[in-house]
Swiss-Prot record:
InterPro entries: AtMg00030-like (IPR044987)
Subcellular localization(s) per the UniProt record: Mitochondrion
Protein keywords: Mitochondrion
UniProt source species: Arabidopsis thaliana (Mouse-ear cress)
Keyword Mitochondrion belongs to the record: yes
The protein, known as: Uncharacterized mitochondrial protein AtMg00030
Annotated GO CC locations: mitochondrion
Amino acid sequence: MFQFAKFSKSKERRLATELGYGFPIGDPWITDGISPWPFASESVLPSQCPGIHPMHSFRSCTQGTLNTTKISMKLTISDCGFEPLTEGFTVLHSTRATTCYHFLFNS
C-alpha cells in the first residue's frame, strides 16, 4: 500500500486531480501524498532516483489515450529566470508557489 492511497477519496486529492496534479506511484520521498509534479497522472512510473528526482521516465499522461511511449524528462529548479534551452529538448514552464520548475522533455 502506497502513501497516497489514504488520500484516494479525500477533498485534497480530488482538488489536486482537478488541477492537473499527479500522484507518482511508489515514491518514498512524498510524505503528504501529494505530488509536486504538475502535468503527470497516475501512469507515472516509479522513480529510480532518490531526493529531488533529476530524471524520470513517464508514460503518456493524456486522458483517454493508450499511448505508453516513454519520454525522458529533466527537471531544473531556478529563480524563474529562463535558462537557455538545451538543444533537442522542449521546455514546459510551470510556477508552483514560489518555485519555478522547468520541465525539459526530450524531443
